[in-house]
From Swiss-Prot:
Principal localisation: endoplasmic reticulum
Nuclear side: 40-81, 145-170, 217-347, 406-475
Taxonomic source organism: Homo sapiens
Record-annotated active site: E336
Family of this protein: Belongs to the peptidase M48A family.
Tissue expression as described in the entry: Widely expressed. High levels in kidney, prostate, testis and ovary.
Bilayer topology: Multi-pass membrane protein
Protein name: CAAX prenyl protease 1 homolog
Catalytic activity: Hydrolyzes the peptide bond -P2-(S-farnesyl or geranylgeranyl)C-P1'-P2'-P3'-COOH where P1' and P2' are amino acids with aliphatic side chains and P3' is any C-terminal residue
GO CC terms in record: early endosome membrane; endoplasmic reticulum membrane; extracellular exosome; late endosome membrane; membrane; nuclear inner membrane; protein-containing complex
Impact reported for P248L: In MADB; does not affect enzyme activity
Length: 475
């Protein structure tokens, strides 16, 4: 009877209290689930101290130990940063941080002569203050991750001055995009009538397509240097491969990622007949500034006292990453172009837009429910921006978790298909060696807990991909 009495008492609570309690309960349930998974994976890092027999041919014990220690440090950092984030979010909700920030935004607007009727203006001030708070509270964690963990394991290439300049630039660019887009979205919702959700969805669709189109040409160059890949054998072979699968390649760029990190990557962008490929310099063995630094440090005299410590130079050289040979770079690109040829990019866009439309439709259904606003401290007003925040971030959180897991499963399937496409191009052997090198260069740990990898990994574990490629190589 006691349990049923408690349940009856729960249902007799005001709707806003039930909603608030359910949001907090679900948030902590997800956090505890994530922590449980992380601890399972951490146990793997701690107990797997020797190279498993099946990895003996592809990874030496020194690299294995370095990757194990790197992932252990990342795991520890993730635990404490996750605990802080969950605690911070809970305290903000419990102590009315969202309505307080809304009232503070109203006061700032009042000082400038804007009354309560200027809701969109107040919403923009709210967004500015919220993103500023998020940036400031996240800064110590980002600093520690970059200058302690990444530095310790040889990945960080930034100075403190570069890091701070980069952070400020990112914040300013974000505001230049976020504030105008948000103001237009709020205006569309205000004037859209009964079918505002259709207009809001179409607007966000156009914005996302525009951002994808201009990102690499106008936004990314604000942070990194892009240079055309020099004429030569690699560029010729990339163009030949692109032509063989009818990929409408117009340009190939190399981005100077080495000034920020020694992690490597490659991607393509653009719509219709204007596709471009971007290679990180850290991916290219013959191009990487990091490899040139190795030669300089090992073949030149120390430039100053700080660099004069031979042990420091040895450690620096040891931590540099080798990148991939041209054949391996082509195999990696064959995999990436496989995503395009197999329609993965289009499928992901369609899924994203179907999800966006569904969310705006459900938002239209729920926005009139005053108890949703009351649950988060808004008893006398129902600002549109706050409605978006409450519904998209809190009310939709169970749906978002399920969708995220489904997309992770789909992503792994796409990765296997892209590997198979690279094999059809005759790149199985080179992709096999490239995956091993990239895993080594990025200190990826090749052993994973099955439940952790199932929930988190958007790419299949290394061993699974290698086994699939080995099977392909035999045919």
């Amino acid at each position: 009877m006691g349990m049923w009495a408690s349940l009856d008492a729960l249902w007799e609570m005001p709707a806003e209290k039930r909603i608030f309690g359910a949001v907090l309960l679900f948030s902590w349930t997800v956090y505890l689930w994530e922590t449980f998974l992380a601890q399972r994976q951490r146990r793997i890092y701690k107990t797997t101290t020797h190279v498993p027999p099946e990895l003996g041919q592809i990874m030496d014990s020194e690299t294995f130990e370095k990757s194990r220690l790197y992932q252990l440090d990342k795991s520890t950092f993730s635990f404490w940063s996750g605990l802080y984030s969950e605690t911070e979010g809970t305290l903000i909700l419990l102590f009315g941080g969202i309505p307080y920030l809304w009232r503070l935004s109203g006061r700032f607007c009042g000082y400038a002569g804007f009354g309560p009727e200027y809701e969109i203006t107040q919403s923009l001030v709210f967004l500015l203050l919220a993103t500023l708070f998020s940036a400031l509270t996240g800064l110590p964690w980002s600093l520690y991750n970059t200058f302690v963990i990444e530095e310790k394991h040889g990945f960080n290439q930034q100075t403190l001055g570069f890091f701070m300049k980069d952070a400020i630039k990112k914040f300013v660019v974000t505001q230049c995009i976020l504030l105008p887009v948000s103001s237009l979205l709020l205006y569309i919702i205000k004037i859209g009538g009964d079918y505002f959700f259709i207009y809001a969805w179409l607007f966000t669709l156009v914005v996302s397509l525009v951002l994808v189109t201009i990102y690499a040409d106008y936004i990314a160059p604000l942070f990194d240097k892009f240079t055309p890949l020099p004429e030569g054998k690699l560029k010729e072979e990339i163009e030949v491969m692109a032509k063989s699968i009818d990929f409408p390649l117009t340009k190939v760029y190399v981005v100077e990622g080495s000034k920020r990190s020694s992690h490597s990557n490659a991607y393509f962008y653009g719509f219709f007949k204007n596709k471009r490929i971007v290679l990180f310099d850290t991916l290219l063995e013959e191009y990487s500034v990091l490899n040139k630094d190795i030669q300089e440090d090992s073949g030149m005299e120390p430039r100053n006292e700080e660099e004069g410590n031979s042990e420091e130079i040895k450690a620096k050289v040891k931590n540099k990453k080798q990148g991939c040979k041209n054949e391996e770079v082509l195999a990696v690109l064959g995999h990436e172009l496989g995503h395009w040829k197999l329609g993965h990019t289009v499928k992901n866009i369609i899924i994203s837009q179907m999800n966006s439309f569904l969310c705006f439709f459900l938002f239209a259904v729920l926005i009139g429910r005053k108890e949703l606003f009351a649950a988060f401290g808004f008893y006398d007003s129902q600002p549109t921006l706050i409605g978006l925040l409450i519904i998209f971030q809190f009310i939709f959180s169970p749906y978002n978790e399920v969708l995220s897991f489904c997309l992770t499963v789909l992503s792994r399937r796409f990765e296997f298909q892209a590997d198979a496409f690279a094999k059809k191009l005759g790149k199985a052997k080179d992709l096999y060696s490239a995956l091993i090198k990239l895993n080594k260069d990025n200190l990826g740990f090749p052993v994973s807990d099955w439940l952790f990898s199932m929930w988190h990994y958007s790419h299949p574990p290394l061993l699974e991909r290698l086994q699939a490629l080995k099977t392909m190589k035999q045919h």
